[in-house]
Swiss-Prot record:
This is Fibroleukin. GO terms for biological process: negative regulation of defense response to virus; negative regulation of dendritic cell antigen processing and presentation; negative regulation of macrophage antigen processing and presentation; negative regulation of memory T cell differentiation; T cell activation via T cell receptor contact with antigen bound to MHC molecule on antigen presenting cell. Gene3D superfamilies: Gamma Fibrinogen, chain A, domain 1 (3.90.215.10). It is found in: Secreted. The keyword Glycoprotein applies. It comes from Homo sapiens (Human).
Length: 439
């Protein structure tokens, strides 16, 4: 009912407003004296406004007076709200147009950087763009694959160059050592006025630095035990075991195998620093062996004994071990002795001029594996061995992999069946002393 009344009042007001407008238009050109007779229409307040801002109004149209509802004052507010909404809609339209322009700007540019007109439907343009991106990705993938192949080729060339440079360095060092050896021998032969070795050793000699066991022998030490030596003053001194009895004495022991109390399946760092008990089983250490063989020209003696009581030896008139940079490369001279030259067995098994290999560092010439890992030890392997004094210690003959202490020229070894029992050694010892030492 209220809605119907409100609708009727609104229609009456609008009709009145339209009548006023029409009346005003028709009487615009009437003279002033005729304007006096026009009926006045007034919109006036009929009371005080309430707190909510609702004010009562009435329209006077003599003889008619129409009282408007209080909500009539809200018409102006509604009108303003509609205007605001129209402005918001217009603003959103403009924003949408800007977005469309920006999206067009992000499209594919032409060769000159200008936007090209679209010749197809939006879906077709998107599909074309996807295909172009896929083509670019495939092209980049192909280029990346080619780059990886080139990197691998360069790595291979670099390794070859490093190997060539290493061989050149080794040959250079070997030639320098050989030249120095020749010079020393020449000077020793020309020194005819020098006092004899017997005269030198007959007088007590006081050494400030003992480079090896022969220096202790020279001052009268005859007891086989541990002594402290300093082969290189630039490096720290260290203890060694001296054999003062075998073949005139003065020997510095590098390695000893007696009872299997020490494990020789060790890492590169262990063989580098040394391990074991100097009075029982041990490896002196590759760094120390290098310093000892660098300070003087040394000879090498190897003593072997099997469980049958057979004792044989091998003697080499030169022995030198390079530094770690050259992977402790081995050099031995001419052979003499009773055990046979197992270090230079034949052209296929030759330990001379070979690098040191351990289970965790492969420097041997076997292309399909690590000889140190297979034979459980560190040694100057070829591909793989005709000798290995650092193999496992077996207390009797054994079968399987020949990973025990091994000397390929030992009597009876060549007759053994490959799948049969292998001989083992009771004792093995490596020791050095200066080449020109005289007891």
């Amino acid at each position: 009912m209220k809605l119907a009344n409100w609708y009727w009042l609104s229609s009456a007001v609008l009709a009145t407003y339209g009548f006023l407008v029409v009346a005003n238009n028709e009487t615009e050109e009437i003279k002033d004296e005729r304007a006096k007779d026009v009926c006045p229409v007034r919109l006036e307040s009929r009371g005080k406004c309430e707190e909510a801002g609702e004010c009562p109004y009435q329209v006077s149209l003599p003889p008619l007076t129409i009282q408007l509802p209080k909500q009539f004052s809200r018409i102006e507010e509604v009108f303003k709200e509609v205007q605001n909404l129209k402005e918001i809609v217009n603003s959103l339209k403009k924003s949408c147009q800007d977005c469309k322009l920006q999206a067009d700007d992000n499209g594919d540019p032409g060769r000159n950087g200008l936007l090209l007109p679209s010749t197809g439907a939006p879906g077709e343009v998107g599909d074309n763009r996807v295909r172009e991106l896929e083509s670019e990705v495939n092209k980049l993938s192909s280029e990346l694959k080619n780059a990886k192949e080139e990197i691998n080729v360069l790595h291979g060339r670099l390794e070859k160059l490093n190997l060539v440079n290493m061989n050149n360095i080794e040959n250079y060092v070997d030639s320098k050592v050989a030249n120095l050896t020749f010079v020393v021998n020449s000077l020793d032969g020309k020194c005819s006025k020098c006092p004899s070795q017997e005269q030198i050793q007959s007088r007590p000699v006081q050494h400030l630095i003992y480079k090896d066991c022969s220096d202790y022998y020279a001052i009268g030490k005859r007891s086989s035990e541990t002594y402290r030596v300093t082969p290189d003053p630039k490096n720290s001194s260290f203890e060694v075991y001296c054999d003062m009895e075998t073949m005139g004495g003065g020997w510095t022991v590098l390695q000893a195998r007696l009872d299997g109390s020490t494990n020789f399946t060790r890492t590169w760092q262990d063989y580098k620093a040394g391990f074991g008990n100097l009075r029982r089983e041990f490896w002196l250490g590759n760094d120390k062996i290098h310093l000892l063989t660098k300070s003087k020209e040394m000879i090498l003696r190897i003593d072997l004994e099997d469980f049958n009581g057979v004792e044989l030896y091998a003697l080499y008139d030169q022995f030198y071990v390079a530094n770690e940079f050259l992977k402790y490369r081995l050099h031995v001279g001419n052979y003499n002795g009773t055990a046979g030259d197992a270090l230079r067995f034949n052209k296929h098994y030759n330990h001379d001029l070979k690098f040191f290999t351990t289970p965790d560092k492969d420097n041997d010439r076997y292309p399909s594996g690590n000889c140190g890992l297979y034979y459980s030890s560190g040694w100057w392997f070829d591909a793989c061995l005709s000798a290995n004094l650092n193999g496992k210690y077996y207390h009797q003959k054994y079968r399987g992999v020949r990973n025990g202490i091994f000397w390929g020229t030992w009597p009876g070894v060549s007759e053994a069946h490959p799948g049969g029992y292998k001989s083992s050694f009771k004792e093995a010892k490596m020791m050095i002393r200066p080449k020109h030492f005289k007891p």
